[in-house]
Swiss-Prot record:
One MF term in the entry's GO annotations: identical protein binding
Record keywords, A-Z: Cytoplasm, Hydrolase, Magnesium, Metal-binding, Nucleotide metabolism, Nucleus, Phosphoprotein
Entry comment describing in which tissues the protein is expressed: Expressed in all tissues examined. Higher levels in heart and kidney.
Subunit structure: Homotrimer.
Any coiled-coil regions, as ranges: none
Record-given protein name: Deoxyuridine 5'-triphosphate nucleotidohydrolase
Gene Ontology biological-process entries: dTMP biosynthetic process; dUMP biosynthetic process; dUTP catabolic process; liver development; regulation of protein-containing complex assembly
Catalytic activity: dUTP + H2O = dUMP + diphosphate + H(+)
Enzyme Commission number(s): 3.6.1.23
Pfam families the UniProt entry points to: dUTPase (PF00692)
Length: 205
């Protein structure tokens, strides 16, 4: 009997040690005893959840990534994207406009938006309008806290008047990350290699 017990111990000890080593490694990789092993759609089963980030905080962060909008009238058209990876959402005119040559117009979309937290909305031209009709966009910044009717300033640099019809795509809205730095007045600034050179100082072309 003592010989049988010794043989059993010699066979069980290596597997037991491997099990204990694996358990310790998992515990360390998950941040000790506070680590939580869970299923994640991104990392797969057994991923370690950060105990410092609650489920509600993660949900709020995901909600903040949405571009929310409200239709202010029955004339409004919901923004759309041309493809899944398109940089901007197309904006649509809510009314008919006529823009004379070398003139501008404020085109209403009749939508109200809330850009994601930490972003601003940049209203950019549509390449098709620029190439075919010499239409450009101005004053294209939508602040994070703006809640008014989104209007697009269109400039007609063409020789002919430009007709905007209700439901036409007039511009694209791009959400860009932004910093909100504090303003600090100082006596001097650090010197740089470029210095005060500007307006073509870096080259002829």
């Amino acid at each position: 009997m003592p010989l049988l017990c010794a043989l059993l111990r010699s066979r069980l000890q290596p597997s037991l040690l491997r099990s204990l080593t694996l358990t310790s490694a998992q515990s360390l990789s998950c941040g000790g005893s506070r680590g939580v092993r869970t299923w994640s759609a991104r990392t797969g089963p057994g991923a370690c959840a950060d105990p410092a980030v609650s489920v509600s905080k993660r949900a709020r962060a995901e909600d903040d990534a949405s571009l929310r909008f409200v239709r202010l009238s029955e004339h409004a058209t919901a923004p759309t994207r041309g493809s899944a990876r398109a940089a901007g959402y197309d904006l649509y005119s809510a009314y008919d406009y006529t823009i004379p040559s070398m003139e501008k117009a404020l085109v209403k979309t009749d939508i109200q938006i809330a850009v994601p937290s930490g972003c601003y909305g940049r209203v950019a031209p549509r390449s098709g309008l620029a190439v075919k009709h010499f239409i450009d966009v101005g004053a294209g910044v939508i602040d994070e806290d703006y809640r008014g009717n989104v209007g697009v300033v269109l400039f007609n640099f063409g020789k002919e008047k430009f007709e905007v019809k209700k439901g036409d795509r007039i511009a694209q809205l791009i959400c860009e990350r932004i910093l909100y730095p504090d303003l600090e007045e100082v006596q001097t600034l650090d010197n740089t290699e470029r210095g005060s050179g500007g307006f073509g100082s870096t080259g002829k072309n």
